[in-house]
């Protein structure tokens, strides 16, 4: 495969960058096996939770292990089109089992290991999983979930690291399986065949099933080649649980280009010191982390570390506050390149290495897609006006854009209208074509006739030295309809008090329009988050609504 990432500026990238999608494509055979022909080419560097033990795998290793895994699955009856629920952490088995499923044409359903029994029950039932692959640490949850459902479609249960009643020992099956898998031995996959199913975060309703097709990895050439700026020699670390979509953002395009992945099998609470130590000493040249990770990293003594080998930093998942970008750049000498996309897409908007970065902006639309900001009548908005981020999808789905929400015609009808996919996210475009994120449509705060985006208020609050993390939502108010309320996690060394509340409120008033300041502030030990690390503003909104509407009616906020 040939890719052209040589653009020196944004306009050149718009002209030159294209993705060719063949009629037939199989990520396992067309990417992994072809890369395996390059002797000794590094694919994966894995380290354990403590950063003590490490293993390195070449593309040839991944090829042979995935062949064994595919043959083991074939022997158990797994075939093209079967849905395979995979709940494994950041372990090597995840990668070669994933590739094995792709070689067979099975449809994977990745799942985070932190799922509850109820979550697992919902996903196995709704997704009609034909097989489950997990490990000893998680199989009891699966057993409990399966007991609660009638699942005649579930034919196989595999344990990756041992045996248990009712479970097949997958490691043993692999030992007996051949490392040879001719392409002709399995059914051919078209680029349009089902590939994987992700479940959305489900912060306001039950998770939707997002279906991607077999060409999806090629779409991530935008993510890896343009936004991550990857070259074949690079080693990239994308901080992500294997069960959510940012893991795909750090795998498919990267391996297609031929870069290596650095994987830290992190467990438990995030360890900022260990992360910085691994980042600066284990060879990663490109780093991508969610905003939550960067917010926690800047609380450490960043000056203690040498960042010279890490040439490129990126962030996505939710907006990153400009203050965090500023602190990071001052301490490391490197700027963070923000990007934007969804479970349903590849990167859509980004700050790319071939253009200037505007802190606080998501960047510009990714070359190769037709992206615009539209109003509710599907007309392009003027500069500075807020609208919905939309992707042109009139003839067929662009490569990398999801096929549909499975079994959800209402959501499909709402998302795809007049030849556009509406992301549901709001933004505005400045005079240079840079997009600034405002929020989900239902995140917008309507106070006394003003429309306030939570992110702009959060960014100002984040500049206060007492604030480690914060979230802003609408709180019902009898006078104004809604008021701005901030939930704040304090930085180490600060104590909650009425005086601190007033200080933060005055701080915000001095730095933005007075009507945007948080009339109410509540301190929390931690913010509610989705499995992917995004702040659950919907949970905070609902809590406020129930508190003010459910007990004694509405009250008036601070005047």
Segments (PLM) and residue ranges:
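Conserved AMP-binding/adenylation subdomain of ANL enzymes
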Residues: 218-235, 242-285, 300
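Conserved ATP/PPi-binding loop(s) of AMP-dependent carboxylate-activating enzymes
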Residues: 368, 379-414, 452
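AMP-binding/adenylate-forming catalytic domain of the ANL superfamily
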Residues: 160, 510-534, 553-559
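Conserved AMP-binding A3 loop
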Residues: 55-60, 187-188, 195-219
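AMP-binding/adenylate-forming catalytic core of the ANL superfamily
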Residues: 115, 125, 132-134, 280, ...
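Conserved AMP-binding/adenylate-forming core of the ANL superfamily
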Residues: 42-99, 116-121, 171, 175, ...
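Gly/Ser/Thr-rich phosphate-binding loop
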Residues: 174, 198, 256, 284-289, ...
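Conserved pre-ATP/AMP-binding loop-to-beta segment of ANL
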Residues: 40-42, 159, 164-165, 175-199, ...
């Amino acid at each position: 495969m040939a890719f052209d990432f040589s653009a020196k500026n944004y306009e050149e990238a718009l002209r030159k960058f294209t993705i060719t999608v063949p009629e037939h494509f199989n990520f396992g055979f067309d990417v992994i096996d072809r890369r395996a022909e390059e002797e000794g080419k590094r694919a994966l560097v894995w380290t354990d939770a403590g950063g003590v033990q490490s293993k390195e795998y070449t593309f040839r290793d991944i090829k042979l292990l995935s062949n064994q895994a595919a043959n083991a699955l074939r022997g158990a009856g797994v075939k093209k089109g079967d849905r395979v629920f995979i709940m494994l952490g950041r372990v090597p088995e995840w990668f070669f089992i994933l590739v094995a499923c792709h070689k067979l044409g099975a449809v994977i359903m990745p799942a985070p290991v932190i799922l509850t029994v109820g979550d697992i029950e919902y996903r196995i039932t709704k997704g009609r999983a034909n097989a489950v692959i997990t490990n000893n640490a998680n199989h009891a949850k699966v057993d409990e979930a399966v007991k609660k459902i009638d699942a005649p479609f579930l034919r196989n249960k595999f344990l990756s690291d041992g045996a248990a009643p009712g479970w097949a020992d997958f490691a043993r099956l692999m030992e007996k399986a051949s490392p040879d898998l001719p392409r002709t031995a399995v059914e051919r996959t078209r680029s349009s065949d089902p590939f994987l199913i992700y479940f959305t975060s489900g912060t306001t309703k039950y998770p939707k099933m997002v279906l991607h097709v077999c060409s999806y990895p090629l779409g991530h050439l935008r993510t890896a080649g343009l936004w991550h700026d990857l070259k074949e020699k690079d080693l990239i670390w994308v901080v992500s649980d294997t069960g959510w979509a940012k893991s795909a953002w750090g795998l498919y395009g990267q391996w297609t280009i031929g870069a290596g992945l650095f994987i830290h099998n992190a467990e438990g609470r995030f360890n900022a010191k260990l992360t910085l130590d691994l980042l600066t000493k284990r060879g990663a040249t490109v780093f991508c982390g969610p905003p939550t990770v960067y917010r926690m990293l800047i609380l450490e003594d960043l000056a203690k570390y040498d960042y010279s080998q890490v040439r490129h930093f990126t962030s996505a998942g939710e907006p990153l506050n400009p203050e965090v970008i500023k602190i990071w750049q001052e301490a490391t000498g490197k700027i963070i390149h923000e990007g934007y996309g969804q479970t349903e897409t590849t990167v859509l908007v980004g700050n790319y290495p071939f253009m200037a970065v505007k802190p606080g902006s998501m960047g510009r639309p990714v070359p190769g897609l037709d992206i615009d900001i539209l109003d509710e009548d599907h007309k392009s908005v003027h500069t500075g006006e807020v609208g919905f981020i939309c992707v042109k999808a009139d003839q067929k789905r662009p490569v990398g854009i999801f096929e549909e929400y499975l079994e959800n015609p209402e959501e499909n009808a709402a998302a795809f209208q007049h030849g556009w996919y509406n992301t549901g996210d709001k933004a505005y475009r400045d005079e240079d074509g840079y997009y600034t994120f405002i929020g989900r449509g239902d995140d917008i705060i309507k106070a006394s006739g003003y429309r306030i985006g939570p992110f702009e208020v959060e960014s100002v609050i984040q500049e206060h030295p007492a604030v480690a993390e914060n979230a802003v939502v609408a709180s019902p108010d009898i006078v104004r309809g809604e008021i701005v309320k901030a939930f704040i996690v304090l930085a180490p060394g600060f104590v909650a008090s009425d005086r601190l509340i007033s200080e933060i409120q005055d701080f915000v008033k001095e730095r933005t329009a007075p009507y945007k300041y948080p009339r109410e502030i509540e301190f929390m030990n931690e913010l509610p988050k989705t499995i992917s690390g995004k702040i659950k503003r919907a949970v905070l909104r609902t809590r406020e609504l129930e508190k003010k509407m459910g007990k004694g009616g509405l009250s008036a906020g601070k005047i």
